[in-house]
Amino acid sequence: MGSISNRKIEKPEHHMVLQVAKEMLELNPNEGIVYYKGEPFSGLGVANYSNGQMAEEITYLRGKRNGLLKRWFENGELSFEAFYENNRLDGKVSSWWINGHLRSESNYKKGVVHGLQKQRYSSGRPFKELNIVNGKEEGLQRAWRENGDLFVNYEAKNGRIFGLNRANLCYELEGENIVTDE
């Protein structure tokens, strides 16, 4: 399993980090601020499964997501990891299948998707590789079927697509014979 490397983040002014169950936190959707007892929350919000296993932990600073967000499957395996700065995703975002295989890796820059984005099948085989620049496709974009066959392969340039996008065979080859659905 991977993990996001340590990053410098601003921490609450006091030495002890307040840990509060997420159900005790209140989100004001108009502001995007999380409150605890009427005040913007600074500390660690946590949630557990009914079996006591950790489900999620997220760091807040003055009511905003600021730091590492981690989620786990009920069996204790890591399922999701992301870093927030001032309520926006920033850096690498990773997710895993319940079998422990990497599911996806995305990159963000101040809340906007930016950089190489990868997705995998639960078997671990590649599914998609997308190149994104400031939230838009730019460069080589590829996707594979689970058997490894390439079915999307195009270049995105200035909002235009050049190449093969979602190619589907209308027939199957068995040996040297063409087999149709008749």
Task: Please provide the spans of the model-predicted regions.
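Glycine/tyrosine- and acidic-biased, solvent-exposed loop/turn segments at the edges of beta-strands
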Residues: 1-182
